[in-house]
Swiss-Prot record:
GO terms for cellular component: cytosol. This is Ribosomal RNA small subunit methyltransferase G. It is found in: Cytoplasm. Signal peptide: none annotated. It is an enzyme of class 2 (transferase). It comes from Histophilus somni (strain 129Pt) (Haemophilus somnus). Specifically methylates the N7 position of guanine in position 527 of 16S rRNA. It catalyses: guanosine(527) in 16S rRNA + S-adenosyl-L-methionine = N(7)-methylguanosine(527) in 16S rRNA + S-adenosyl-L-homocysteine.
Amino acid sequence: MEKLNFLLKNTALLPTNLQKERLVQLVLLLNKWNKAYNLTSVRDPMEMLVKHILDSIVVSPYLQGNIFIDVGTGPGLPGLPLAIINPDKKFFLLDSLGKRISFIRNAVRELELTNVEPVLSRVEEFKPDHQFDGVLSRAFASLKDMTEWCQHLLTDQGFFYALKGQYNMEEVSALSAQFSVEKIIEMNVPELVGKRHLVLLKKIRINLMNYL
């Protein structure tokens, strides 16, 4: 907890004591499961706080809307940390590997989270009965693949939130003309070596009246 409090001082985030306890508990669960299921290459719990928890929750101030899907979530990143500090928002966490979804289900139960829905599926095959205000991805795919595979999940007003390391103009150039980059935000993740960026993208709405 001491380490987490120190890291949070270098952000604008103000989680409650219960939320901080749950973030620490999530790290302990991830560390425990990781020994058997190899969910992440990060082995040190202190490193997990920086590389997984802080790297996820710094996105929180930029989320617009109430219902989100985290595609290729792995062991629930960034979805689980974001759900912990945003109890008023709903998060669907999608992955195609059973062991990852098993971990997420266990974490949801242990942390008593009521705003998380684990989904075992490939993103292309997932056909929900509603769309989402935001599609999140962290180390999931290129911008081109993310937008094309996930476009059916997003409302017309929604955003794609792509967490990236070094910003790559080649990825932007490869985007289909039906998507636009709305904003690129350089993220400050305390004690994380290397640059982090949040890329916000939208679907371009075509006004059919222009063609009549």
